[in-house]
């Protein structure tokens, strides 16, 4: 159970769940500058810089990361793992969309899109429509920031400013979404912020809106043992203190439900094919795996893809 969440909480890009999007974008910005980058996100840095002095901006600041690493020998490995994980995750789901459009899908839905810039940076085929669903203030920040820098989408982009706990299917259809057409759905960095029953409801709604041939991709997180969650909380608080930033504890924003359905199993039982890839396998395949202290197999995430029968 999350201690900082309520059934009707909202946020902008600088608070609560919204601020975690800054962390993800900062990791993409750092990855883009590597000589051996797995992804290219030329807009991540701009989106991070405009988000204010949040706790997660420092991930893209090598000097601050080095300072934190000097005071804790395990911090360097931890942040290398965090950045590599985000790079591998982004690479995996970029490839998912590439395969989907190669299969003829031209309708894309990104759930809880945050600072996702795929509508602006991926080479979408003509006729592709990308729907982004998220909190109104989050979508407004991204659109206004990129527009101010002269950045235009590479596909037709339609915003659906609504909380996923509300009637988002109706809002999506009202924006022009056609349930009769195959769709590629993405739930990246989302499910851990939903209670188990809300996750089931989300996939039921996706299934209801999906024509045969639709595809879905999702990231699901493993469950951390309580003692490991506490060690993570203490470590991040210590790091924040050392580099003089406001601490932020993601574990207080997420729902760790041991009865949460495995995504692949849920999909297979509801008319989809499904394949699950452990994130550590994806990281090893791309030579980006980093051993982190106190890690355990259950704490890793899984990347799941499926096709509607």
Curated annotation (Swiss-Prot):
It comes from the Bacteria. Pfam families: LCM. One of its GO terms (biological process) is methylation. Its EC number is 2.1.1.-. Keywords: Methyltransferase, S-adenosyl-L-methionine, Transferase. One of its GO terms (molecular function) is methyltransferase activity. S-adenosyl-L-methionine binds at residues 134, 163-164. Belongs to the UPF0677 family. Exhibits S-adenosyl-L-methionine-dependent methyltransferase activity. This is Putative S-adenosyl-L-methionine-dependent methyltransferase Mflv_0743. It comes from Mycolicibacterium gilvum (strain PYR-GCK) (Mycobacterium gilvum (strain PYR-GCK)).
């Amino acid at each position: 159970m999350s201690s900082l969440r309520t059934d009707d909480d909202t946020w902008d890009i600088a608070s609560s769940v919204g601020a975690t999007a800054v962390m993800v974008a900062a990791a993409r910005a750092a990855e883009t500058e590597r000589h051996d980058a797995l992804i290219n996100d030329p807009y991540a840095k701009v989106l991070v810089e405009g988000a204010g002095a949040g706790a997660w901006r420092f991930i893209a600041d090598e000097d601050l990361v080095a300072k934190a690493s000097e005071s804790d020998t395990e911090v360097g490995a931890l942040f290398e793992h965090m950045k590599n994980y985000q790079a591998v995750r982004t690479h995996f789901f970029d490839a998912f969309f590439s395969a989907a459009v190669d299969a003829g899908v031209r309708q894309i839905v990104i759930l809880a899109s945050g600072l996702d810039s795929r509508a602006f940076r991926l080479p979408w085929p003509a006729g592709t429509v990308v729907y982004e669903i998220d909190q109104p203030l989050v979508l407004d920040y991204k659109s206004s920031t990129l527009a101010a820098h002269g950045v235009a989408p590479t596909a037709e982009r339609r915003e659906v400013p609504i909380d996923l706990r509300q009637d988002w299917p109706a809002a999506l259809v009202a924006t022009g979404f056609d349930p009769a057409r195959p769709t590629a759905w993405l739930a990246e960095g989302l499910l851990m912020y939903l209670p188990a029953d809300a996750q089931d409801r989300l996939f039921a709604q996706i299934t209801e809106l999906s024509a045969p041939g639709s595809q879905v991709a999702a990231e699901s997180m493993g469950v951390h043992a309580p003692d490991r969650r506490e060690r993570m909380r203490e470590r991040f608080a210590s790091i924040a203190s050392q580099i003089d930033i406001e601490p932020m504890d993601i574990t207080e924003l997420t729902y760790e439900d041991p009865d949460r359905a495995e995504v692949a199993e849920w999909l297979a039982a509801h008319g989809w094919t499904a394949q699950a890839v452990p994130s550590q396998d994806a990281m090893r395949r791309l030579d980006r795996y980093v051993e982190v202290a106190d890690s355990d197999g259950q704490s890793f995430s899984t990347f799941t893809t499926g096709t509607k029968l």
